[in-house]
Structure formats: structure tokens, C-alpha cells
């Protein structure tokens, strides 16, 4: 356990293992603890970095702070603090905005990008229209509650569902970002067409937040991007089927060598 005084905050992070770095960026339903099924697997060959985004876990967001609009610069500052020049990025949901935004601004620092259950920070007309159509069909306000994982998890593994909810409950109340997203951290249509960073999208076939057809479409916007769909999983493949998730990510990273 360690702390980094960076970017106006005191960021909590952990580092496990040695070798090439993999940074894991959690989603809105988690924090650094979310990756408990990934770190023991990947630390045998890689240096695994987990952290709490500002406003999550043990990283406090200053009053009136920029919130999510600072996530990508926070990541850059953390890497600088750790002396990591290039890294693999594994992003879950909200963490996709962090990592896609970081890659859009500093592609030379990314060995490979995994976008799990997310397409955040990507801006393209077809993607936007698909997401709008999805939200227009929803009859209730959009929330993470009850949608973070597939109902089948609570039926078959109530212990795992309870653990997920308990990890999420450790986070303080969320704050809304202030200001506008820096355009440097937006993967525009033009940037996506020229994308050179190896990229993998992973989707749960039961995800109702970012359904697999939308993520598969997102993968077509990046030259050479890969797409994997995992059965019987909702919005948290890394948690619901860690064995499949770890295997898919491990094969992708090995292929980037």
C-alpha cells in the first residue's frame, strides 16, 4: 500500500510483481480492491498497478475539484511518480474514460489497451446514435445499481454478488465533474482512424449498460482492434468470470510483444 502526492491529490495505489507494467483502472462500482482476481494471476509475470480514482476508495477528491475530468492527467502523474514510461492499460467501465483518454493524448506511452465493458471517451457519430437509441428505450433513470453484474451471478453465486456490492459500498458519495473534458482526452473519429495502439474490447453478453453489439461496433472504429464476448456475464466480466477475462487479456498482452 502506498500513496502518491500528485496532481493536487493524495492518490492511493498498490504495486505487485515485477516486469512490464499493467495498470488496472476500476469502474464506478469499484476501487483498487476490484482487481483481487486479476493481480494474483498477472503479478507472476508483470508489475501490476492498481489505484483508486479521485473520489473513490481512499483517494479523496478536494472540494470543488474537477472529478472525472482529471482522471487521465491523474494517471499520467501516477505513471511519472512510479517512473513508468510505457504500460499496458486494462480499463473497466468508467476506467475506460481514463485509459482511452490517456491513450488519445499519449499513445506513445501505451503498449496495449483493454477496454472492458466500456467505450467511454470515444466520440463518433454512429457510436453516439447507438448509445442514444439505447438510453431512449430505458424506462427508468440510468443507474449502476442492479446493472453492475448479470442477475445470474446473484442466483448462482450470491457470495460473489455480496462481495461486489460490499466493495462498491466502500466508496464515498460520487461528485459530478466540473468544467469540460479536455479535448486532448477525447478519441475523436479522426484520432480513431489513425489509431496505432493495440486495442481489445471485452463485453459481457448480458451487459445492459454497454451491450456487446455496441462494443463490437466500437471495435470496428479502430484499425486492427480485437473484440471478445464472454457468455453469462453482465457489465463486470472481470469480476463475474475472472478465469475467462484473465485468459483473454493474457493472450492479448502476449500478442503485443
Segments (PLM) and residue ranges:
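Conserved HGGG/HGGXW glycine-rich cap/lid loop of the alpha/beta-hydrolase fold
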Residues: 9-61
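Alpha/beta-hydrolase fold catalytic core
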Residues: 1-22, 44-47, 85, 186, ...
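Acidic catalytic loop of the alpha/beta-hydrolase fold
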Residues: 206-210
Amino acid at each position: 500500500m502506498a500513496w502518491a502526492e500528485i496532481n493536487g491529490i493524495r492518490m492511493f495505489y498498490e504495486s505487485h510483481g515485477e516486469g512490464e507494467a499493467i495498470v488496472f483502472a476500476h469502474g464506478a462500482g469499484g476501487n483498487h480492491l476490484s482487481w483481487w482476481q486479476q493481480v494474483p494471476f498477472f503479478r507472476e509475470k508483470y508489475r501490476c498497478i492498481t489505484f483508486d480514482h479521485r473520489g473513490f476508495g481512499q483517494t479523496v477528491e478536494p472540494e470543488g475539484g474537477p472529478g472525472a475530468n482529471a482522471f487521465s492527467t491523474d494517471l499520467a502523474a501516477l505513471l511519472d511518480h512510479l517512473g513508468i514510461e510505457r504500460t499496458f492499460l486494462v480499463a473497466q467501465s468508467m476506467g475506460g474514460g481514463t485509459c482511452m483518454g490517456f491513450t488519445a493524448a499519449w499513445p506513445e506511452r501505451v503498449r496495449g489497451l483493454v477496454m472492458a465493458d466500456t467505450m467511454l471517451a470515444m466520440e463518433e457519430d454512429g457510436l453516439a446514435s447507438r448509445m442514444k437509441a439505447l438510453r431512449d428505450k430505458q424506462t427508468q433513470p440510468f443507474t449502476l445499481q442492479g446493472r453492475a453484474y448479470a442477475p445470474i451471478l446473484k442466483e448462482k453465486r450470491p457470495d460473489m454478488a455480496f462481495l461486489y456490492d460490499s466493495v462498491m459500498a466502500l466508496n464515498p458519495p460520487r461528485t459530478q465533474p466540473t468544467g469540460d473534458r479536455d479535448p486532448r482526452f477525447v478519441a475523436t473519429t479522426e484520432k480513431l482512424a489513425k489509431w496505432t495502439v493495440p486495442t481489445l474490447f471485452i463485453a459481457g453478453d448480458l451487459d445492459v449498460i454497454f451491450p456487446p453489439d455496441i462494443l463490437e461496433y466500437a471495435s470496428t472504429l479502430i484499425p486492427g482492434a480485437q473484440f471478445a464476448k464472454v457468455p453469462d456475464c453482465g457489465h463486470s466480466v472481470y469480476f463475474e468470470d475472472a478465469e475467462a477475462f484473465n485468459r483473454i487479456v493474457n493472450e492479448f498482452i502476449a500478442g503485443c510483444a
